[in-house]
Amino acid sequence: MHDIRLLRDQLDVLREGMRRRGKLTELGDVLDRAESLEQARRTAITELEAQQARRNKVTQEVAQRRKAGEDATALIAEGRAIGEQITALEQRRNEADAAVQAMLYELPNIPLADVPEGDETANTVVRTWGTPRTPDASIVPHWDKGEALGMLDLARGAKISGSGFIVYRNRGARLVRALMNMMLDIHTEEHGYEETWVPLVVNRASMTGTGNFPKFEEDAYAITEDELFLIPTAEVPVTNLYRDEILDAEELPKRFCAFSACFRREAGAAGKDTRGLLRVHEFDKVELVRYANPETSLEELELLTSQAETILKRLELPYRVLLLAAGDTGFSSAKTYDLEVFAPGVGKWLEVSSCSLFTDFQARRANIRYRPAAGEKPRFVHTLNGSALAFSRIIASLLEHHQQPDGSVRIPEALQPYFGRAVLA
């Protein structure tokens, strides 16, 4: 959520941010209505202050007349009328306040200055690592290879839960566990993250705090009677760990990692490639979350991204890092890097991580603050997160990129101690 002072004093900054995202046409009316409501709020406050001053004066005059033994009936009636006007003005002010706050929830974050303008076609490759394997007919797509190896059971996953749900069996289940342990060990032992194990269901306040609600409520799986929601990512519960709390500056940066299942209805995914593990409703992921001092948050983003890249290097998967254009940057993010691996069996680059800086956008919604020094006024932290990494597409890439001429699949050296073997055959 934005600082309401932007709306009051720097509306042009908000308009420019929405323009860079390609959202000005869509959200221009929201800004116009918010500006109108803010003007109405200011008018109500001005009138309210005038009426409060008048009431105070009338109250004093009533006291003086009574003290002098004079009739104050007319003044008392006037005071009551003023009180009714004050009540009405307070209601107008409160209604305008609530409406403006609701509209602020509809506005995405403002992209940082170095984020390129445009849609996804303007995403910029900032670096690459490794050499992607050239697709050829001998490389079996991961869905066929996984089923042939007895690792994936797509049909029974669909029978149990519907399309987009996967059953991992035998070595497939072991591979998921191996990936989890390897990633968590690297992030906790090498990168200094605190491991957390968080609930898979959260309340509305948590989803609102990270920016998932109200904008993307249709994408969430809901437990309606309890008003709880399955998490789309561990970002939601981990970011909300310190909701409505004040940290000391010395505690920053705070670093958390968490493994979790993730649930997404993908309501807007019709027509996209959903074969195999490419687009599913439930998947596993290790998430990194940071609370940072605003002065160092850009450096924190670069560090977090490099830590996600470490996993891809250990898995020996060639990848590229994209700086997302403003129109492709997520709702809450001010700057995002996507990590993509190449899957030669399907001939596509697959996103396996998004590493984002949210500035104080989430912190304002969740009221997460820090105190710069003793006695100073609390300020909002900057939040960051990144997938490190999402398992389903990683498994797809492993099965395709490390596929051998004899049909076996080589297990990367760093993963072998966790998986217990060097080859899948």
Swiss-Prot record:
Query: InterPro entries attached here?
Result: aa-tRNA-synt_IIb (IPR002314), aa-tRNA-synth_II (IPR006195), aa-tRNA-synth_II/BPL/LPL (IPR045864), Ser-tRNA-ligase_type_1 (IPR002317), Ser-tRNA-synth_1_N (IPR015866), SerRS_1_N_sf (IPR042103), SerRS_core (IPR033729), tRNA-bd_arm (IPR010978)
Residues bound to L-serine are: 233-235, 287, 387
Pathway field of the UniProt record reads: Aminoacyl-tRNA biosynthesis; selenocysteinyl-tRNA(Sec) biosynthesis; L-seryl-tRNA(Sec) from L-serine and tRNA(Sec): step 1/1
Q: What is its EC number?
A: 6.1.1.11
| Signal peptide extent | none
Q: Does the keyword Manganese apply?
A: no
Keywords, A to Z, come to: Aminoacyl-tRNA synthetase, ATP-binding, Cytoplasm, Ligase, Nucleotide-binding, Protein biosynthesis
What's a GO cellular component annotated to this UniProt protein?
Answer: cytoplasm
| Binding residues for ATP | 264-266, 280, 351-354
Any idea where this protein resides?
Cytoplasm
Write down what this protein is called: Serine--tRNA ligase
What family does the entry list?
Answer: Belongs to the class-II aminoacyl-tRNA synthetase family. Type-1 seryl-tRNA synthetase subfamily.
| MF GO annotations | ATP binding; serine-tRNA ligase activity
Relate the protein's function as given in its record.
Catalyzes the attachment of serine to tRNA(Ser). Is also able to aminoacylate tRNA(Sec) with serine, to form the misacylated tRNA L-seryl-tRNA(Sec), which will be further converted into selenocysteinyl-tRNA(Sec).
Its main subcellular localisation, reduced to a broad class, is cytoplasm
Q: Which GO terms describe its biological process?
A: selenocysteine biosynthetic process; seryl-tRNA aminoacylation
Which reaction does this enzyme catalyse, per its entry?
A: tRNA(Ser) + L-serine + ATP = L-seryl-tRNA(Ser) + AMP + diphosphate + H(+); tRNA(Sec) + L-serine + ATP = L-seryl-tRNA(Sec) + AMP + diphosphate + H(+)
The free-text domain remark for this protein reads: Consists of two distinct domains, a catalytic core and a N-terminal extension that is involved in tRNA binding.
- How does this protein assemble? Homodimer. The tRNA molecule binds across the dimer.
Name of the gene encoding the protein in the UniProt record: serS
**Is Nucleotide-binding given among the entry's keywords?**
yes
